[in-house]
């Protein structure tokens, strides 16, 4: 019975320590940059599972007006690569709704069109691509959407 109590105490101590470490990192720009840069490095090495975990940790642990939206973008992209379309759409929608003026928003809309296309929802894909062209005519995402529409004809 004493072993059970010791194990519970040890687990509680580990949980508290884990939370303390996480909280220390919240206000530490060096930790923030280290996590984000490690996520990018893993992404570049196509270690998608590691990259996903790091980006996810980043958005759950840090506030950063530039890197949080990028993290959501990359979480959406990794999910799309791994064909988890629902999770991918959720991340792109989070970027769009939480950071509507971020420079990745037009591409996030285009990626949602890609998700519809991969789901064989051709009409919704076309509608989304037309939205990108109409709302962001001077963005490179618009050119990509236009090309995809031409390829669908």
Q: PLM features: what roles do these ranges have?
A:
Residues 1-153:
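Acidic, polar-rich low-complexity tracts and alpha-helical solenoid repeat scaffolds
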């Amino acid at each position: 019975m004493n072993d059970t109590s010791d194990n519970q105490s040890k687990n509680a101590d580990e949980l508290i320590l884990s939370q303390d470490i996480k909280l220390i990192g919240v206000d530490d720009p060096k930790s923030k940059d280290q996590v984000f840069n490690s996520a990018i490095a893993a992404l570049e090495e196509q270690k998608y599972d590691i990259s996903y975990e790091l980006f996810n940790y980043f958005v759950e642990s840090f506030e950063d007006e530039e890197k949080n939206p990028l993290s959501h973008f990359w979480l959406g992209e990794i999910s799309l690569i791994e064909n988890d379309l629902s999770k991918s759409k959720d991340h792109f929608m989070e970027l769009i709704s939480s950071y509507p003026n971020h420079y990745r928003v037009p591409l996030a809309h285009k990626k949602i069109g890609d998700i519809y296309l991969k789901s064989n929802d051709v009409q919704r894909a076309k509608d989304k691509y037309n939205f990108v062209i109409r709302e962001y005519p001077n963005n490179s995402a618009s050119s990509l959407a236009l090309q995809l529409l031409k390829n669908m004809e």
